[in-house]
Amino acid sequence: SPDPASTGQILQELAEGMRDSFNITVICVVPSYNGTVAPEYQTQRFFCENLDAIKVIRLRVPGFNKKNKVSRVKNILAYFVGAMKATTIVGKQDYVFSISQPPILGGLLGVYGKWKKHAKFIYNIQDFNPEQIMAVKYEESRFINGLMMWFDKLSCRKSNLVITVGRDLADTLESRFKNVNVPKCMVINNWINEKQIYPL
């Protein structure tokens, strides 16, 4: 799977559910959820794999320490640049599906993919990061907050469809655009595979 994190599992199940109707290509990082990159994934920039009829392009990224903000930023930026490069080599795509992780950059990757591939862009929002950051005052700079909001609104505007995982996020989208020219939006809740997830 692309990543053992819950979002990675959901995206894997989504890809598996669509593979009979679409040719699916997934761009993701090499396994590195805990910050460590295995030696076999440090030898080249891209690793192309085929997982159950799904083409997977894994990007090499530097390891990181979750407590070290600088190493985390380096890791995220390496993914962003690598994903842009991978987008140029994946061939023709009819649809680009991107999620709101990493914050802000996930949406911008979708915008880039739409432009580069002349494809339709579906933006799946798991969290509205600028609003979250403002709520907890993680970043005090109004300029930085405003810039982040501008870029994420751009991603929403450029999408052909925004999918949120809850009604509250759809309401936030409407508030973000002050109910004027709100991007087309659909609510699809995240799901679980009851055959694989069960109470302990």
Task: For the regions a language model picked out, list residue spans one by one.
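Well-ordered beta-strand positions
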Residues: Y95, N160-L161, K184
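Membrane-proximal helix-turn-helix segments that form the acceptor-binding/catalytic region
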Residues: M84, L105, Y112-K116, R142-T164
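N-terminal subdomain of nucleotide-sugar transferases
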Residues: S1-D52
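A short, charged, and often flexible helix/loop element on the N-terminal side
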Residues: I54-V81, K137-E140
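Helix N-cap/beta->alpha junction signal
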Residues: S100, G166-R167
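Carbohydrate-associated surface elements
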Residues: V30, D168, I188-W191
